[in-house]
Curated annotation (Swiss-Prot):
Primary residence: cytoplasm
Keywords assigned by UniProt, alphabetized: Actin-binding, Cytoplasm, Cytoskeleton
Organism name: Dictyostelium discoideum
Gene3D superfamilies: Severin
GO cellular component: actin cytoskeleton; cortical actin cytoskeleton; phagocytic vesicle; site of polarized growth
Keyword Hydrolase applies: no
Protein name, as recorded: Coactosin
ADF-H domain boundaries: 1-132
């Protein structure tokens, strides 16, 4: 298990959840082998987060708020991202899936979960397709003419 006791983790998660501010992502990193701490947060969406995540020698976890839906129904959706760069050693890579469970003790409201390992995987369009597919109802072809 990883150490996720830092109060900054929960505070950053709560900030991303809240619609009352512009913060739409937070990023957690390792401090040592097992302690997970806040690395950063921002309001620039997936594009900004992808720049922060793209670290080939790091293991990271991120939480992202996106807006999805159609003209009839826009809503916030939440994405949990795990990142394990291609330069991470085998033992550390193996710990990502185990430690992910610890991070999920802090991050609980997850609509979509993705795992990335290389920069080419960081594609916003593909991510939003996954978010839309997970969202359920789509009223875009069912417009009312009243």
């Amino acid at each position: 298990m990883a150490d996720v006791s830092s109060t900054e983790l929960k505070a950053a998660y709560d900030e991303v959840l809240a619609d009352s501010n512009d913060t739409n992502w937070c990023l957690f990193k390792y401090e040592g082998k097992n302690k997970i701490v806040l690395s950063g947060k921002g309001s620039g969406g997936f594009a900004e987060l992808a720049q922060e995540i793209n670290q080939p020698s790091e293991r990271l976890y991120a939480y992202l708020r996106v807006v999805s839906g159609d003209d009839e129904s826009k809503r916030s959706k939440f994405v949990f991202i795990s990142w394990c760069g291609e330069e991470v050693g085998p033992l550390a890579k193996a710990n990502v899936s185990v430690h992910k469970a610890s991070v999920k003790q802090v991050i609980k409201n997850i609509g979509v979960e993705v795992h990335y390992t290389v920069a080419d995987d960081l594609n916003e369009e593909e991510l939003m397709t996954k978010v839309r597919k997970s969202s359920g109802a789509d009223y875009s072809g069912n417009k009312s003419t009243n």
